[in-house]
Amino acid sequence: MNREKFKIGELRPSQLMHSFGVGSIVDFPNFSGIIMGFEDWQVGELRAQVYERRLREAVHARLGPRIKNIYKVPVPVSENPFSREENSKGVPVEVFPRWLRCPVCGRMAQAHDHVVEFQSDFYSPDRMKFRHAQCTKASGGRPTMIPVRRLVACEFGHIDDVDWVYFVHQGESDCKGPLYWKDYGVTGAAEETEIECKTCGKKQKLIAAFGDGDGGKRKSAIPEQCNGHHPHLRHTDTGCKGQPRTIVLGASNSWFSMTVSVIAIPVEGSELDGLVADHWTNLNGVINVATIPAFRQGGLLPGFEKFSDDQIFAAIERYRSGAGASPGGAGSANASSDSTDLKLPEWQTFTKSRERVEDRSLSFRSMPIPDDFKADISRIVRVDRLREAQALIGFTRLLSPGEFGEWDDDVNEMRVPLARSKDHSWLIGNENKGEGIFIQFNENRVKAWCEQSAIQQRSADFLRAHAEFRSRRNLEPNDALFPGMRYILLHSFSHAFMRQLALSAGYSHAAIRERIYSRAPGDPGGPMAGV
């Protein structure tokens, strides 16, 4: 039995990349909060970095060379997890949504309102709460207020509380009366909930916050113009052209991560050449051997301990002249030099390498193909060791950015920044170490399957649904980014295989991730058909 105890509000580094990153909303026992932008982070706590040359090149291709460092999320190391020092570390959070309500009397108020009191407890986050100080219905004590679980968001990443004063008064109003939340049913459905102003008597049912009802005849009662608010940046954009939509607190479409992810592949050259390539962001400023001891003392040269200063400087000069390490060393001499093409070097490494590869980041060997599958599968690779490097570069709301960083201009326009400053120079990242199975399918069989008339008809159905999806979101052209039946085949196989792997090997399904290599013969770097 796992007896490890977790603190309230504790997150794994991987969760900050995919589930609860900057701009996302996290539920605590008594309220919710939003992960703040990088200006609010304690930069002094960020020391360990993610070193992977291909990852940095891919980030630079998307955000520019201003990004100098990719830091790992700090992890508390104190033996006493409840010490003041350890409790002062972590990821900054602000209360969001700010509108709260009393479950006893229904009074609604913002967190800073005079009727709301904050109960703080430095050592017990589960005891932190907002109390209604002037509840007229509570018999003894001050009830704990809970978040009003309705928000407004737009496809350009803005999010805010519903303007409840506007909502109740059905437009702009000078009325400052208190608002009350009233449930008339037992289900808590929006049709059975009403918001009322006690001063002027105006009221509005909660269902009015959601448009497109009654066959599209019901108009939303929220403002038609997005206010452009980014609470994680403490900033408001002007002139947002997005259409605000009401969402529920905790909705899965309130935050989608945009991450750049690569598998570390072997590099040509010696071990030292590979280390220099991985740490080039720090080493490109080294102009003579005398500066290397300072880099050692600053902890910027992990893994270099067995090499002398002269050896390190010689490797730096080799790399600077272009004679050092390059990706794809394990038999992948044709690895792509395009830093935005993240899959091609990996595909070449797994499909064109020798039968066995041993590297500090990647170890794999080719396995025999079962007789029943030799016609369909070209290669099976058992990956005993791999390292995946990731960097969070932004996020979207309402619209998912898609799989594996292959975004079009529409999605890039909707990417929400992680910091206010356009000159911000660092990101957060993560490294995952694990194992895996690579399967390369027979290209001729995949191509023949895709060309069947029944599959072509199915492809037309998928394309029609894909175009309708993009049309509803005003994304042009409507048929852009359609993955094709090749990808659908590989994706379907991948999920079926992961499910069976979880059942047969004892892995948690959440611990298994897929990586799909799908390109048609005419695509750059194609064809690819593997998982």
Regions found by a protein language model. Name each.
Residues M1-V168, E172, P178-G185, H229-V531:
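Extended, well-ordered protein cores
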Residues P147, K205-A209:
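Contiguous, function-dense segments enriched for cysteine-driven chemistry
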Residues T193-E196, G201-L206:
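Extended charged low-complexity segments that act as oligomerization/scaffolding linkers
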Residues G211-D214, C240:
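Extended acidic/polar, glycine-enriched regions
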Residues D214-N227:
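Internal insertion modules embedded within essential enzymes
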